[in-house]
From Swiss-Prot:
The chain crosses the membrane at residues 41-61, 76-96, 108-128, 157-177. It comes from Ricinus communis. Homodimer and heterodimers. GO terms for cellular component: plasma membrane. This is CASP-like protein 4C1.
Length: 192
């Protein structure tokens, strides 16, 4: 066996390989990877449903004649439009996570961002739709709905779609809360 050549003229040995800049992912079995993919797809489906219902509610309220004369209906439009935009962003973040295997933001920030915003926007939708329901009930008792039945029906549809958006955002919030708990217990958003 040949001996290694000694260093000549004060050369220094080559540096040892550097550790990776990003931490290596945890080992997961094939079954756990499938569970994670299903979990992330379920979140994506809930976010897509929230987006569809909130966008539809905003469109129904926007096309409703004279909706802007009532504060509660303006609140429904604004809340559903905000939630639709937020859901669109969260869908993009979910697709990123499914395709790339990591989060858009650092993991701790992403977990708390999702949970906190899901909570805030769910309560925003619930309060807007509750206020609009009270106004719609008042208008039904008055002569507004007798004069323009289409206005009231379209308002009812927009409010119902807003409540459906709240339902799916609430389910997303439950899954986000589960991820927060997993992060607090395991130090990772994964539950396996």
């Amino acid at each position: 066996m040949r001996s290694p050549q000694s260093l000549r003229n004060g050369e220094t040995p080559s540096p040892s390989p550097r550790p990776p800049r990003f931490p290596t992912p945890h080992f997961h079995s094939t079954v756990s990877l499938q569970k994670l993919k299903r979990f992330n797809l379920l979140i994506l489906v809930f976010r897509l449903s929230t987006f569809c219902f909130s966008l539809a509610s905003s469109v129904f309220m926007l096309t409703n004649p004279t909706w802007y004369h009532f504060d509660a209906f303006r609140y429904v439009f604004a809340a559903n439009a905000i939630v639709a935009i937020y859901s669109l962003f969260e869908m993009a973040a979910s697709v990123w996570e499914i395709s790339r295997g990591n989060t858009l933001f650092p993991e701790i920030l992403q977990v708390w961002f999702d949970f906190g915003h899901d909570q805030v926007f769910a309560y925003l939708l619930l309060s807007a739709d509750s206020a609009a329901t009270a106004l719609a009930k008042t208008l039904k008792g008055g002569d507004t709905c007798a004069a323009s039945n289409a206005f009231c029906v379209q308002s009812y549809i927009a409010i119902a779609l807003g409540f459906a958006g709240f339902l799916f955002l609430g389910l997303s919030s439950l899954l986000s809360g589960f991820r927060v708990v997993c992060f607090l217990i395991n130090g990772s958003r994964f539950y396996v």
